[in-house]
Amino acid sequence: LKNAGVAPKDLEVIISCGVARDVEEPATAYIIQEKLGAYNAYCFDLANACNGFISAMDVLDSFIASGRCELGLVAVGDILSQYVTWNTSSKRDLHLSSMSYTFGDGGGAAILQRIKNGDEGGIRARWFLSDGSYWRVAVIPLIDSDRRYFKSNAANIEAAALEHVPGGVETVMKALNWDINDIALIIPHQVSAQIIENLFYKRLGMPQEKIYWSFPDHGNVGAASMPVALCAALAEGKLTPGDKVLLVGGSGGFGAGVIGLVI
């Protein structure tokens, strides 16, 4: 809010979009509203695994485009460490738990508001895909017991990403008439070095310097991965107003999403 020059009272919508929740009911967005004192805001949660942030941005952007609101907040705070177990009884259990061993805890937020006439900033294009045939590949069970831990098949997640994400990146770049030289940074979901290498470097042929990689510092912080990386890139001076950015998400489900935006 401070960076955007926005007062809490001016927020019209608050969307909380994390994997983790503070309570089952009510929506975490109400807790955020109370802590901010943003009592003019319509509050709700949006759950879409690690794609929560870009999905919430898409929804809020649609609210603004339709005239429902002028200004809103997308916020995520994920404590993924609670879904990690080191108590594995077999090689299979270890394999299914292995992706959780890079989980971190983190949070981020973004303000979206209607652009002024002549301003070319904001979301310029988006693409989303859902393939429910992969839903069993990455799961946190809805049970209150010592079995409520993240389990996944890393090879199947990578296969889904390689199957679906390249087409989304190409679709958004074509829609915007961007080539790789136009893009300042590509900010992917920070999931694993192997997926980044196979997807962006080998399949899409992207140069390494175009991929912003915060994984070594923060690990996989779920739906917070992209806002954390975006904020870090801004703080490091790697992005400035007017720069073109691709946000590229992949999540359990399997879900894929790409947003082309101008800072």
Annotate each predicted stretch with a short phrase.
Residues 8-12, 38-42, 66-72, 97-98, ...:
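Short coil/turn connectors at secondary-structure junctions
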Residues 65-102:
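Flexible, glycine-rich active-site loops centered on histidine and acidic residues
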